[in-house]
Amino acid sequence: MAQPGRGAIVAVTDHPQLAGSAQTVREHRRSVSRWLGYGACALAGIFWSTGFFFGKIAFQRLSVEHFVLYRFLFACAGLLFIVERPRFSARQWRVLLIASFLGIPVQFLVQFYGLKLTTVSHAALMVGTMPVILAVGATTFAGEHLDVKGWLALAGSTLGMALIISSTSRHVAGGGNRLGDLLVIAAMFFALGWILINQRLMREGHSPMAVTVWGLLTGTVMLAVWVLAQSGLPPIHGVGWRIWLAVAASGLLCTAAATLLWNWGIHQVPASRAGVFLNIEPALGAVLGVELLGDRLGLGTWIGGALIIAAAVVLTTTEKREPEGLVG
């Protein structure tokens, strides 16, 4: 009986030109996948960078609580079609629920309370401290090693954060707010807990997408319970199409689409390079605030922002492990 599979292998190996052609096709496909991966990660970073901008627009008609709830309801609608059947044990469900509580209602309510007080530019630059906070958290709680470059990046990011906060002024329109900046930074520490706990589940064999999506769904349920108990039903009538577009974009683009793009992209590109696209968020977010919302950045803020972004670039371009799945 003929064996087509084996015959094909012999035919290819017996003809160097065919073997070389097959190798060229494989290399071309890998190259295309890699560039598509870079594009997906970059687009995810761009979508994340617009989150504060859309939030400021929504605050014209919605409270912080109702905006965050609407954001995640739209995000859940955008991710429902990829929900996998959960395979968590009872213990893992408890771990996931703790992470979801920190990552969705706590982190995002604190973060957007901060945005309500400060400017888009300041909030975006504060988010730029996340790679450094994550590196320190992984060193402290997960036993990872932070080298000399990492500690220098930590020092630079801390100095930049201090410069931005110290340069805020309540008397200058568009100049930021100290309490708002601090709340955004505090939200990053809740995000740290969320990420580190999720990493435990991923190390136990669960995919980043499964952990991310189920964490988002359960976190949204917790968020809804809190918001409805504290603030009642969100408004539907009289909101205005401009606000609805901002809210929908915040959920569908900044959370659902960015999550899908990032989780696909990081599996197509070298792990040491994917993380650099996280730095699009603070840089582009600050530009959006200045150019579209009239934020005013003093010299201290410009210098501080440059230090934060430089520190994040140093960490993400020298990082050796693969960036984990993220949700924004």
Provide a role label for each language-model segment.
Residues 2-66, 173-200, 219-225, 327-328:
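Glycine-/small-residue-enriched transmembrane alpha-helix faces in small-molecule transporters
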Residues 58, 67, 71, 114, ...:
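Hydrophobic/aromatic residues within transmembrane alpha-helices
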Residues 32-38, 61-65, 69, 88-94, ...:
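Juxtamembrane helix-entry segments on the extracytoplasmic side of multipass membrane proteins
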Residues 79, 146-168, 188, 223, ...:
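Hydrophobic transmembrane alpha-helices of multi-pass small-molecule transport proteins
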Residues 49, 73-77, 158, 192, ...:
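Small-residue-rich packing faces within the transmembrane alpha-helices of Major Facilitator Superfamily
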Residues 66-77, 103, 108, 112-154, ...:
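Specific alpha-helical transmembrane segments that line the substrate/conduction pathway
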Residues 68-70, 123-129, 197-220, 251-291:
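Helix-helix packing/entry segments at the starts of transmembrane helices
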Residues 46-52, 80-127, 137, 163, ...:
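Specific transmembrane alpha-helical segments of multi-pass solute transporters/efflux pumps
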